[in-house]
Amino acid sequence: MAKEKATLPPTGAGLMRFFDEDTRAVKVSPKGVIALTLLLIAFEFILHMFGSSIFG
């Protein structure tokens, strides 16, 4: 007697869509994000060191 095939439940493939290529957002590379973060850290450090003398 042959074994019966086990049937798997439906996975729902195709029910959800991810729109990766259809975006209107500003695209920033990972290097750009790191550079902007480092610039922000440097700016805050400079403000911490010299801000009281500059802004009174």
From Swiss-Prot:
It comes from the Archaea. It is a single-pass membrane protein. Residues 50-56 are extracellular. The chain crosses the membrane at residues 30-49. It is found in: Cell membrane. HAMAP family: SecG (MF_00751). InterPro entries: Preprot_translocase_SecG, SecG/Sec61-beta/Sbh. Component of the protein translocase complex. Heterotrimer consisting of alpha (SecY), beta (SecG) and gamma (SecE) subunits. Can form oligomers of the heterotrimer. Belongs to the SEC61-beta family. Residues 1-29 are cytoplasmic. GO terms for biological process: protein transport. This is Preprotein translocase subunit SecG. Keywords: Cell membrane, Membrane, Protein transport, Translocation, Transmembrane, Transmembrane helix, Transport. Pfam families: Sec61_beta. It comes from Thermococcus kodakarensis (strain ATCC BAA-918 / JCM 12380 / KOD1) (Pyrococcus kodakaraensis (strain KOD1)). GO terms for cellular component: plasma membrane. Involved in protein export. The function of the beta subunit is unknown, but it may be involved in stabilization of the trimeric complex.
